[in-house]
Structures are given as C-alpha cells and as structure tokens.
C-alpha cells in the first residue's frame, strides 16, 4: 500500500517501500502540519523547482535524514553548494531510476529562480512506487503535452495539481488538466496558502465532474492508494 500525505501548500509525503518527500516547504508555510525533524528516515526528496515555497526545507531534511535530493541538474548543484555534504541526484527532463524508484522529471510551464536569478527549469514528477503511479505537477499552467504523461506512464493513480491561480493553473485550467491526464484520483494543492492564490476546491470538484475522483485533503490528511 502507498500512502500520500498532504503536508500543506505543495508539500507531500509518499510512504511505501520507500519514503519520499516532494517540495517539503514546512518552515514558514502557513499550512504546514509537520516539522523538518519529523522526517529523519526519509529516503528521497524531490524538488520541482527552485522557488522557496518548493525547495523549502529540502536541504535541512537531507542533512538530518541522509536522503538524496532529486532535482533538475542546476537546482541540484545549487542545493549541493548551499548544503555541503548533502547527496544530490541532478537530472533533467526524462526517466531515471533512483534506489529502485522509477522517476520521470516532466516539464512544467513556470519559472525557476531564487526569487531573482534563474536556476534550472521548473518541472513536475511522475513517480512509480510499489506499482502505483503518482504525478506531482509542481507549479504549472495547463498544457496539451500532459496527454503524453498518461499515454507513456499511465494510468495515473493520483495527480496532485495546483488550483490556486496567479502563479499556476486556476480551477478551470486544472480541470482541463484532469481531462488530459485522465488520473483515477486528483488532489488539489497550492491554494489558500496566501491571499493571491485563493481558490475553492469545491468549485474545482464541480468542474472535474465525473472525469476523476476529486479528494480534497486538509493539511495532515492522507490518501491510500
Ligand atoms: Ni513556483
Ligand atoms: Mn509555488
């Protein structure tokens, strides 16, 4: 069984035969329900892009857990320089395998920077763990190539999609993404953390209709796959 726990904003904890964090922004995250110290035994940390609300505590958690950080090559180098001794796996768009976990880094239409200077490119991740397929979109606008993700790696058991607008897709665009991705279940994320990304997950649910099962997780809640 694979559990997908929502940690607030875009942070998720995936637990199966491996323990995986994605975008662990905990410190300073108004929605956070966990602290970096809660993840001393995590195996992998996936970072979708360099913005602070995604890199978050990745470096610190890697230090206390010995977890490997998987990210775009340039972002991995940036983290390795900031957090000496942390093990990183720098990759680019494409498939790879890290510690027996199949990971595809896929494009995302978004920027990636330290807030000022560009670092690498933004991405999403498709993770196959214990026979389950999880897609974390990162921060992105909707794009037609999302069709390829289900075509090449599907069926997608759960898609984690931003719905907050302003920096990413809003509810309308995310509902279109569901049409392209054809996931079994979709979990909205990256909304209501701050006023500019206010969104109503019930409106998203209505727009998705019967195209997928929408599970609205509160920070701290989890989904079993
Ligand atoms: Ni971002
Ligand atoms: Mn973001």
UniProtKB/Swiss-Prot annotation:
SMART domains: Lactamase_B. Keywords: Hydrolase. One of its GO terms (molecular function) is hydrolase activity. It comes from the Archaea. Signal peptide: none annotated. The keyword Hydrolase applies. InterPro entries: Metallo-B-lactamas, RibonucZ/Hydroxyglut_hydro, UPF0173, UPF0173_UPF0282_UlaG_hydrolase. Belongs to the UPF0173 family. This is UPF0173 metal-dependent hydrolase PYRAB05000. It comes from Pyrococcus abyssi (strain GE5 / Orsay).
């Amino acid at each position: 069984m694979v559990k997908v726990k929502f940690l607030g904003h875009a942070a998720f904890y995936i637990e199966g035969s491996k323990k995986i964090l994605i975008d662990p922004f905990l410190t300073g995250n108004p929605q956070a329900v966990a602290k970096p110290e809660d993840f001393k035994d995590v195996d992998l940390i996936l970072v979708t892009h360099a913005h602070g609300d995604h890199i978050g505590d990745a470096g610190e958690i890697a230090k206390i857990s010995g977890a490997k950080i998987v990210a775009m090559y340039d972002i991995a180098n940036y983290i390795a320089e900031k957090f000496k001794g942390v093990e990183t796996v720098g990759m680019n768009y494409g498939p790879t395998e890290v510690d027996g976990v199949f990971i595809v880094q896929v494009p995302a239409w978004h920027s990636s920077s330290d807030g000022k200077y560009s670092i690498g490119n933004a991405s999403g991740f498709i993770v196959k763990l214990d026979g389950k397929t999880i897609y974390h979109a990162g921060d992105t606008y909707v794009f037609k190539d999302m069709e390829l993700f289900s075509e090449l790696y599907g069926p997608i058991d759960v898609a984690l999609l931003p719905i907050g607008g302003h920096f990413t897709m809003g509810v309308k665009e995310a509902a279109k993404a569901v049409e392209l991705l054809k996931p079994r279940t979709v979990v909205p994320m990256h909304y209501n953390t701050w006023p500019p990304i206010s969104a109503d997950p019930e409106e998203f649910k209505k727009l998705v209709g019967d195209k997928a099962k929408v599970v609205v997780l509160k920070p701290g809640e989890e989904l079993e796959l």
